[in-house]
């Protein structure tokens, strides 16, 4: 069976709350780091989430 192209990543809040989302990303089509604006329930605001590796 072939190995999938999509890799698991973690989106970490830039607000410094420690909150994160997990998602998958195709490394071949999107080699750059992902930055998305998502809701942080700790500060109850939309903040920028940046890509980090899952350890």
Curated annotation (Swiss-Prot):
InterPro entries to which the protein is assigned, alphabetical: Ribosomal_bL33, Ribosomal_bL33_CS, Ribosomal_bL33_sf, Ribosomal_zn-bd
Span of the signal peptide: none
GO terms, molecular function: structural constituent of ribosome
The UniProt record lists the keyword Phosphoprotein: no
Keyword terms: Ribonucleoprotein, Ribosomal protein
Family: Belongs to the bacterial ribosomal protein bL33 family.
UniProt-listed GO biological process terms: translation
Keyword Nucleotide-binding among record annotations: no
GO cellular component: cytosolic large ribosomal subunit
Matching HAMAP family: Ribosomal_bL33 (MF_00294)
Membrane-crossing segments per the record: none
Name used for this protein in its record: Large ribosomal subunit protein bL33
Domain of life, per lineage: Bacteria
């Amino acid at each position: 069976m072939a190995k999938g192209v999509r890799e698991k990543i973690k989106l970490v809040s830039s607000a410094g709350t420690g909150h994160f989302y997990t998602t998958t990303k195709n490394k071949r089509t999107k080699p750059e780091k992902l930055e998305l604006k998502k809701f942080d329930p700790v500060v109850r605001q939309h903040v920028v989430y940046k890509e980090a590796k899952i350890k």
